[in-house]
């Protein structure tokens, strides 16, 4: 019986140390230059799934936009990057009401049945918001749809 306790202790101790190590977070907050905790500092939109492993990932910051798209099955991958100006950034972020972001509801993933998952990630100075298949939320999704439409307007035609 003492051997079992010893083995359990041998497994438990390193796990506890790893847990403590990973829970210590000494990251400093990002310096965004903004004093408003509701200012948006990062947007990510992705559409991933399907039988062939299609993906489109768009990352947007105040000064740049980056797109990755491809099909995993065919091993095709394309990337596009561009700088954006403050007018474009303001146009994108104006579609989002930060006060209602917590009210948006996600839906279950559809990738397990060869469906696509649409994911939005919006980071403010204060909080990080993630939504998966939020289009089922008929009340608050409208702002994400407007954001998606604005993003599509920025992309070159070969990536739409």
PLM features: residue spans?
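Post-signal-peptide N-terminal segment of Sec-exported extracytoplasmic proteins
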Residues: 46-77
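A generic structural signal for short, solvent-exposed coil/turn residues
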Residues: 16, 35-37, 52, 59, ...
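Sec-dependent bacterial lipoprotein signal peptides
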Residues: 1-22
């Amino acid at each position: 019986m003492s051997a079992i306790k010893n083995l359990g202790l041998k497994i438990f101790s390193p796990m506890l140390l790893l847990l403590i190590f990973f829970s210590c977070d000494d990251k400093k907050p990002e310096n965004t230059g903004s004093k408003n905790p509701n200012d948006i500092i990062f947007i990510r939109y992705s559409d991933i799934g399907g039988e062939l492993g299609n993906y489109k990932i768009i990352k947007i910051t105040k000064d740049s936009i980056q797109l990755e798209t491809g099909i995993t099955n065919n091993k095709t991958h394309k990337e596009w990057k561009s700088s954006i100006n403050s007018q474009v950034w303001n146009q994108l972020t104006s579609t989002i009401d930060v006060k209602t972001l917590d009210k948006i509801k996600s839906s279950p993933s559809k990738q397990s049945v060869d469906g696509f998952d649409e994911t939005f990630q919006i980071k403010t100075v204060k909080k990080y918001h993630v939504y998966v298949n939020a289009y089922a939320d008929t009340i608050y999704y409208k702002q994400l749809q407007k954001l998606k439409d604005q993003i599509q307007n920025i992309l070159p035609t070969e990536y739409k």
